[in-house]
Design a protein with these regions (language model features):
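Short functional hotspots where side chains directly engage DNA or cofactors
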Residues: 242-247, 343, 354, 366-384, ...
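Conserved tyrosine-mediated DNA breakage-rejoining catalytic core shared by Y-recombinases
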Residues: 233-291, 298
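N-terminal DNA-binding module of tyrosine recombinases/phage integrases
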Residues: 20-125, 129, 288-302
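Basic, Lys/Arg- and aromatic-enriched nucleic-acid-binding interface segment
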Residues: 150-154, 165, 169-233, 241, ...
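N-terminal core-binding DNA-recognition domain of tyrosine site-specific recombinases/integrases
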Residues: 52, 56, 80, 92-168, ...
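Short N-terminal "domain-start" leader segments
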Residues: 1-22
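Short, basic (Lys/Arg/His-rich) helix/loop patches that form interaction surfaces
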Residues: 16, 202-211, 223, 273, ...
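DNA/chromatin major-groove-contacting recognition/catalytic segments
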Residues: 256-261, 358, 379, 383-399
């Protein structure tokens, strides 16, 4: 019988275990494909002390138990040698048929991971605490906003979920609630009051320069459309006979300055929005003022867009966001009582809140807003306060 191999403390070493000249322990094993791998530790057993000046790590035999469990469950060795960046790239490659805006968001995450040390980390080395600390560092040290971090994790988390499903790793280190780790510093896009809306619209209507955008902004406040939906409207989408707006697409301009027609944001986004007489009058004015370009722009087979820029191209969200910004800036320089930040999306919030205050049936409001989930209608877009609650209680009691 061959003599048992022992370490420097005279302990019997198991098959595959050796102690190196520098005192470290090494374990050699074969993965399910027959390829050799090695793991190291300064400790043989969990009760051993870590040598002074050495990084604390799992003992060799603790690592062996993990390896045996992974081999039994067909978990790939070393996470298949994927880095975080490589895993995310593989995940994105599986996401075919996504919108251009979504694809652009994916590319932003890839570009970020190419520069960040996390992108070079091997996926099996990323633990829950590493994932948490990384996100905290992004906010505290790199100044990333909650929204930006939410977008990054929104790609990394499902990529790691795919790795679990592919038996590359055992657990998803990003499977936790983001709000429990970093501070949500997102600025809530509040609806403005009816009085603020009135002052804002009156200022636009009477301003020699910005009055050209009055009808469009009035429509945004009175229909709750998404700005991309409004920009995508063509003459054919305005049904004067049935007094409704047919919303069945949105207009997007990509980072490459390409104009793209996409389906509405959600399945419920395709809808018909009733027109009030005031909204109908605004559309008629827009069409009356619309000059016929030398070459009618065509995007995705559609033409007849309501608003065109100075180059004869359809106006997009960025145009309107800038108009809103300049209007509020001019208003606040003119009047002592300033207006808060108002954007096209604030118009959407405001419309929803006004309809809720007016007692519109929640399901009807959900349909008009194009929300797939009524909780979005009720919880995200309705900004009701104590005064509204008080008025409702008084109304019920009076009845």
């Amino acid at each position: 019988m061959s003599e048992k191999r022992r370490d420097k403390r005279n302990r019997i070493l198991h098959q595959g275990e050796v102690q190196l000249a520098d005192g470290r322990y090494r374990f050699k094993y074969l993965d399910n494909a027959g390829e050799a791998h090695y793991v190291y530790s300064w400790r043989l057993d969990k009760n051993d002390r870590t040598p002074v000046g050495r990084k604390k790590d799992l003992s060799l035999r603790e690592k062996e138990r993990q390896i045996q469990a992974d081999l039994f469950d067909q978990i790939a060795a070393n996470g298949g040698n994927y880095t975080v960046l490589e895993l995310v790239e593989k995940y994105i490659a599986t996401k075919t048929g996504v919108r251009d805006s979504t694809r652009a968001g994916y590319q932003t995450v890839i570009n970020f991971l190419k520069k960040d040390p996390m992108g070079k980390q091997r996926i099996d080395k990323v633990k829950l605490s590493d994932a948490r600390l990384w996100l905290i560092k992004l906010q505290k040290e790199k100044g990333k906003s909650y929204s930006a971090i939410h977008s990054i994790r929104g790609v990394v988390r499902p990529a790691f979920r795919m790795a679990v499903e592919d038996d590359l790793i055992r657990k998803n280190p990003f499977d936790f609630e983001l709000a429990t780790v970093i501070v949500n510093d997102s600025v809530t896009r509040e609806a403005i009051s009816r009085e603020q809306e009135r002052r804002f619209l009156k200022f636009i209507q009477e301003d020699w320069h910005f009055s050209r955008y009055y009808e469009g902004i009035f429509i945004l406040f009175k229909t709750g459309m998404r700005i991309s939906e409004f920009c995508g409207l063509t003459k054919k989408n305005i049904d004067f006979k049935h007094r409704c707006i047919v919303v069945d697409h949105q207009l997007i301009r990509t980072a490459k300055m390409e104009y793209v027609i996409e389906e509405p944001k959600t399945e419920s986004g395709t809808r018909k929005i009733p027109m009030t007489p005031e909204v109908e009058a605004c559309f008629r004015t827009i069409l009356k003022k619309r000059s016929t370009p030398k070459i009618e722009p065509v995007v995705g087979g559609l033409s007849g867009f309501l608003y065109l820029d100075k180059n004869g191209r359809p106006m997009v969200a960025l145009h309107w966001e800038k108009y809103f910004e300049h209007i509020v800036e001019k208003y606040n320089k003119t009047y002592k009582e300033e207006l808060p930040k108002i954007t096209p999306h604030v118009c959407r919030h405001t419309f929803c809140s006004n309809m809720a205050r007016s007692g519109m049936n929640p399901k009807t409001l959900q349909y008009i807003m194009g929300h797939s989930d009524i909780s979005v209608t009720l919880n995200t877009y309705t900004h009701l306060g104590f005064e509204d609650a008080e008025a409702e209680v008084r109304r019920i009691c009076a009845g």
